[in-house]
Structures are given as structure tokens and as C-alpha cells.
Amino acid sequence: MRALLLLSLSALLCWVSADIRCHSCYKLPVLGCVDRKSCRLEPGQQCLTTHAYIGKMWVFSRLDCGTPGEPCKPAVNQTNQKGGLTYNTTCCSQDNCNSPAPRPTPALTLVFLTSLAGLGLWLLH
């Protein structure tokens, strides 16, 4: 009886943990999450969030599901010598635990794109 109860509990835990989802996108300044998707975690994997910085200035973030080929490995201030970027990676294993920030307002995106267009015209002048 005890073995049957243990087997049932194990099956229930596997069923519940098999449906954990993570956010997947590249998060950029002003634009927010680009190409926003949802991915399902494979057994034994975790959601990941990697923030990239130049000095103390945030450049971008990557949110995704860890995979057997690229598992989530927590790291603080890991520096890429080639690009000079510093990476901080965090891992979590709850449903949608790597939640992205809310989508930017259309007005803010319009201001950014208008400024970018103005800069482009100024450089061409």
C-alpha cells in the first residue's frame, strides 16, 4: 500500500513539473521584450535570465528555457573578454518565474524611433 502511494505521488509530481513554462525573448532598452514567446521546460532544466552590461550600463537581457545542450548556470559578473560585456545569469524553476517587464507604451516607442530617425537625418546632413 505504501509503495502504491509513493508511486502515485511520484507520478503526480512528474505530471505537475512537466508543464512549467518560461518566458523567452530578448529584452532591449526602450523596446522591451522582442520576439516574445513561451517555452516549456524539459525535465531537470530551469528558466534562465541573463542581463548584459557595459560597465554599469544595462545593454540587453535574454530570457529563455534552459536545455540539456545549454543548461542554466547561475553567474555573477562573468566578463566576456572579446566584447567587454559583463553577464549576470539567474535560474529559477517555477512557472513563468523569469517574467519580463511589461511591454513599453506605444508613446515611448514612438519617441525612441523619432529620436533615432532624427539622429539618422542629422548624420546624413
Curated annotation (Swiss-Prot):
Source superkingdom: Eukaryota
Prosegment residue ranges: 100-125
Residues covalently joined to lipid (GPI-anchor amidated serine): S99
InterPro entries registered for this protein in UniProt: LY6_UPA_recep-like (IPR016054), LY6G6C (IPR039237), Snake_toxin-like_sf (IPR045860)
GO cellular component terms attached to this protein's record: plasma membrane; protein-containing complex; side of membrane
Positions glycosylated per UniProt: N88
Main location: membrane
Secretion signal, residue range per the UniProt entry: 1-18
Membrane topology: Lipid-anchor; GPI-anchor
Keywords, comma-separated and alphabetical: Cell membrane, Disulfide bond, Glycoprotein, GPI-anchor, Lipoprotein, Membrane, Signal
Disulphide bond pairs: C22-C47, C25-C33, C39-C65, C92-C97
Pfam entry (one): UPAR_LY6
Record PTM text: N-glycosylated.
Location in the cell: Cell membrane
PANTHER family, per database record: LYMPHOCYTE ANTIGEN 6 COMPLEX LOCUS PROTEIN G6C
Protein name as annotated: Lymphocyte antigen 6 complex locus protein G6c
Taxonomic classification: Eukaryota, Metazoa, Chordata, Craniata, Vertebrata
